[in-house]
């Protein structure tokens, strides 16, 4: 047992170091690739967000770290930038529904054949959270220059239970209940 403890601590240290490298890489890529990364955010505010992520690394699980990286990139408020970690195999989209926003609310616009009865249904809530509340809570992680773009992109993010779970907005990382 004594031998395992240092190995576990070493693995944890290595993971924290790797996450710091990932964060540094993301920041460097933003500053090198983006033509005007600080057009919509002051550089000092961006640096505060990055430092907050850096300090929180020891407490973050994988999903929390991915959320933190998404927030860093979304903070520059550019709809053409974004991390798609929550659309990867690590966080499968288990929902068989696709939704879009309309003036009257959020509606199912496509779905698998076994859920065809839900086509055109209005989504009221996910895991008891009103859909509009979910969009508001997720907005700082969705890359967008304005509120319209957040509303447009939100359904892609909200169909990923792992994302909502990482935010503490649904109980399970691999499923949720949709209310119509």
Describe the predicted segments one by one.
Residues 1-180:
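Flexible, low-complexity junctional segments that flank or bridge functional domains
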């Amino acid at each position: 047992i004594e031998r395992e403890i240092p190995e576990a601590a070493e693995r944890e240290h290595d993971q924290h170091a790797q996450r710091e490298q990932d964060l540094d890489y993301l920041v460097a890529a933003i500053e090198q690739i983006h033509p005007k990364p600080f057009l919509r955010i002051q550089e000092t505010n961006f640096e505060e967000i990055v430092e907050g992520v850096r300090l929180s690394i020891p407490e973050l699980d994988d999903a929390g770290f991915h959320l933190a990286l998404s927030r860093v990139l979304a903070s520059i408020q550019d709809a053409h930038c974004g991390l798609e970690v929550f659309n990867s195999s690590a966080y499968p989209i288990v929902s068989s529904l696709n939704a879009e926003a309309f003036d009257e609310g959020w509606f199912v616009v496509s779905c698998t054949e076994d859920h065809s009865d839900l086509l055109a249904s209005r989504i009221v809530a996910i895991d008891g959270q009103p859909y509009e509340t979910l969009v508001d809570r997720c907005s700082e992680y969705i890359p967008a220059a304005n509120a319209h773009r957040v509303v447009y992109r939100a359904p892609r993010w909200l169909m990923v239970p792992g994302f909502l779970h990482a935010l503490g907005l649904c109980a399970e990382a691999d499923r949720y209940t949709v209310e119509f």
